């Protein structure tokens, strides 16, 4: 027989003391890579070149078949390297992050006041559209 314990209406475990109130400093990497292979069905077209400055949210890649579908930069910084594989296939775009984060301003919107086309346009322009899976 297994030792299963069935709980009804929860279980209070008396633990003495309180949680330590401390936070850890976040660690942000120096170099971020945007990999087109992470986005299924995307045929990437490069929109930046080495040495270009990018802001978080600015487009880095676009789809060749649907140019309105964009992949945006997750950090602000400088494009340090464009890595290509066999037959010049685009493998990754490396971005060297700068000290502070600067963002592209897409404005604030209330979803209830927007039409479906406006929501779709905002998702396409700001980048999260490529992460949606149907």
Predicted regions and their residues:
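Generic structural motif
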Residues: 38-42, 54-57, 66, 70-81
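Short hydrophobic beta/alpha edge segments that flank linear recognition/processing sites
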Residues: 55-68, 91-99
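N-terminal, Lys/Arg-enriched amphipathic/low-complexity engagement segments
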Residues: 1-47
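Generic detection of short hydrophobic beta-strand segments and adjacent strand-loop junctions
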Residues: 32-34, 71-73, 104-109
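Buried, small/hydrophobic-residue-enriched core segments of structured protein domains
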Residues: 85-134
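A generic structural signal for short beta-strands and their flanking turns/coil linkers
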Residues: 30, 73-75, 91
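Acidic, glycine-anchored pre-beta loop/turn
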Residues: 48-54, 83-86
